[in-house]
Every structure is written in structure tokens, then in C-alpha cells.
């Protein structure tokens, strides 16, 4: 486990939390009531504030991901999936939601709208070569390993 600093902009909302003991990602909550028009009516997503700021340790990132239930039942997803939060970002976390259904979606303040997955990462150093080593797969892509 790692310790992550969090600042609640809206103290009436719960902290992001894990829905179950085995959950990998934390639920994020909407800070506002909102209406999300059907796909195509607004030409993109609607940016929803979550009411939190976080300070990830160096070497960590967070991904904002859709909630599977909202996607399956209502057609609601995160437009820029995954949304990337870097360790040096200190602003409020926002979720860019999109409605792929054909009816408006009414979101309520305090509802779970997305998930936050915190991951450790490594930075790279490029080592330029004249030619990459060969593999069995080679340059095969886009279905080359079968359907």
C-alpha cells in the first residue's frame, strides 16, 4: 500500500473508495447534478468535477476509467479513456463523461461516475539502434495472431 495525499474541495462528498475488498480501482463521485445529452447533441463530452485534488508520489500515475455498470446499463463512458493524472498535477480531478445512448442521462451530486486506478511506472531512456532484434512475431499486427 502507498499513502496518497488528498484534499477534499467538497467535504460533504465521500473520499474515493474501493467498492469491494478485491477492487483495483476507487470510485470517484460527482460534485454536481448534471444532465448529459445523448451522443451527438453536444459534440463531445461533459466535464464533471469530482471535488478532490491528490498528490501522487513520484513514480506513480492515476488513470480515470469508466464504471462498467454505468456503461452497460446507461451507455455512459469516459470520453478520453483512460484519463491520465500525472504525479505533478495538483488541480481538481475532472471526468469527461459521454453519453452513447439515445436518451438524456441525469446525474446526481454524490453518484459514482468513474474509477481511479493508481499505478506505479518506470521512466525510460531511449537507446537508439540501427535495427531492432528479431522476434517470432516480427512486424505482424492488427489481427496477425488470430481472432
UniProtKB/Swiss-Prot annotation:
Its EC number is 3.6.1.23. Pfam families: dUTPase (PF00692). GO terms for molecular function: dUTP diphosphatase activity; magnesium ion binding. Pathway: Pyrimidine metabolism; dUMP biosynthesis; dUMP from dCTP (dUTP route): step 2/2. Keywords: Hydrolase, Magnesium, Metal-binding, Nucleotide metabolism. This enzyme is involved in nucleotide metabolism: it produces dUMP, the immediate precursor of thymidine nucleotides and it decreases the intracellular concentration of dUTP so that uracil cannot be incorporated into DNA. Belongs to the dUTPase family. NCBIfam families: dut, PRK00601.1. This is Deoxyuridine 5'-triphosphate nucleotidohydrolase. It comes from Dictyoglomus turgidum (strain DSM 6724 / Z-1310). The lineage of its organism: Bacteria, Pseudomonadati, Dictyoglomota, Dictyoglomia, Dictyoglomales.
